[in-house]
């Protein structure tokens, strides 16, 4: 079986090519999905990549969540499809109600573009099963609205249910409880602000630590 990973492109998406390259790097077929498509083209998993979908008008991810392709993604999630939202994709997943909380302006109100260290907290997701708990990853962060916020009840629930997937070592954007990524209750949907697709080889990125997410998704698809 050849796993097919769909990568969505919205107007304003920047990192779809990188996400598709990461999928191919682990041996999957990368399938392009346009925002106006009402068909997931038979893919086994979906990546909602980073950028500025629809120019981030109204609010980051607010318009993208209403697109035909996201209607299909929401339906597919109900059937257990693995979905990864990266940066703006994380914002889209929160706006679509697939993940709790929201992403707001960074502390200091500056755009941040630098490599950061993350710690893997949960390996019980479709996107992190290849990692050992407490593994440290070096990946890129580039966002102006990357500060994760949620109510204390939601934060307690995420911690209590093991749904915090990544935490920052150096919390430079002010995310509550150092949260860099979270998952759905069943671990099939993961959202994260840093960019694993930019860390798939040391020649072009800070490390190859991001490959583990895409290999994990491959394992999940092939095991199902």
UniProtKB/Swiss-Prot annotation:
Q: Which residues belong to any copy of the Glutamine amidotransferase type-1 domain?
A: 4-224
Any one of the GO CC terms: cytoplasm
Question: What PROSITE patterns is this protein classified in?
Answer: GATASE_TYPE_1 (PS51273)
Subcellular location per the Swiss-Prot or TrEMBL entry:
Cytoplasm
Give the active-site positions.
87, 195, 197
> What Enzyme Commission number(s) apply to this enzyme?
6.3.5.3, 3.5.1.2
What role is this protein assigned? Answer: Part of the phosphoribosylformylglycinamidine synthase complex involved in the purines biosynthetic pathway. Catalyzes the ATP-dependent conversion of formylglycinamide ribonucleotide (FGAR) and glutamine to yield formylglycinamidine ribonucleotide (FGAM) and glutamate. The FGAM synthase complex is composed of three subunits. PurQ produces an ammonia molecule by converting glutamine to glutamate. PurL transfers the ammonia molecule to FGAR to form FGAM in an ATP-dependent manner.
UniProt keyword Ligase present:
yes
Name the UniProt key words of this record, in alphabetical order: ATP-binding, Cytoplasm, Glutamine amidotransferase, Hydrolase, Ligase, Nucleotide-binding, Purine biosynthesis
Predominant cellular place of this UniProt entry's protein: cytoplasm
- What name is this protein filed under? Phosphoribosylformylglycinamidine synthase subunit PurQ
Gene3D superfamilies in the cross-refs: 3.40.50.880
A single GO molecular function, which one?
Answer: ATP binding
Assembly state and interactors? Answer: Part of the FGAM synthase complex composed of 1 PurL, 1 PurQ and 2 PurS subunits.
Indicate whether Membrane appears among the record's keywords. no
Q: Which GO terms describe its biological process?
A: 'de novo' IMP biosynthetic process
Q: What is catalysed by this protein?
A: N(2)-formyl-N(1)-(5-phospho-beta-D-ribosyl)glycinamide + L-glutamine + ATP + H2O = 2-formamido-N(1)-(5-O-phospho-beta-D-ribosyl)acetamidine + L-glutamate + ADP + phosphate + H(+); L-glutamine + H2O = L-glutamate + NH4(+)
- Pathway involvement of the protein, from the record: Purine metabolism; IMP biosynthesis via de novo pathway; 5-amino-1-(5-phospho-D-ribosyl)imidazole from N(2)-formyl-N(1)-(5-phospho-D-ribosyl)glycinamide: step 1/2
């Amino acid at each position: 079986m050849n796993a097919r990973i769909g990568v969505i492109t919205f107007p304003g998406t920047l990192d779809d090519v990188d996400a598709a390259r990461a999928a191919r790097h682990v041996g999957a077929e990368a399938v392009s999905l346009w925002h106006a498509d009402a068909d997931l083209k038979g893919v086994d998993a979906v990546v909602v990549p980073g950028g500025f979908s629809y120019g981030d008008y109204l609010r980051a991810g607010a318009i993208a969540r209403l697109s035909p392709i996201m209607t299909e993604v929401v339906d597919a999630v109900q059937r257990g499809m693995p979905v990864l939202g990266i940066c703006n994709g994380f914002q889209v997943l929160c706006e679509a109600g697939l993940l709790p909380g929201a992403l707001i302006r960074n502390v200091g109100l500056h755009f941040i573009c630098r490599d950061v260290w993350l710690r893997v907290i949960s390996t019980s997701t479709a996107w992190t099963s290849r990692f050992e708990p407490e593994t440290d990853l070096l990946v890129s962060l580039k966002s102006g609205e990357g500060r994760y916020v949620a109510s204390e009840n939601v934060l307690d629930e995420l911690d209590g249910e093991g749904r915090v997937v990544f935490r920052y070592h150096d919390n430079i954007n002010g995310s509550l409880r150092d949260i860099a990524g979270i998952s759905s209750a069943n671990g099939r949907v993961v959202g994260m602000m840093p960019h694993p697709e930019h860390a798939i080889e040391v020649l072009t990125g800070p490390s190859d630590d991001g490959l583990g997410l895409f290999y994990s998704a491959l394992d999940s698809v092939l095991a199902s």
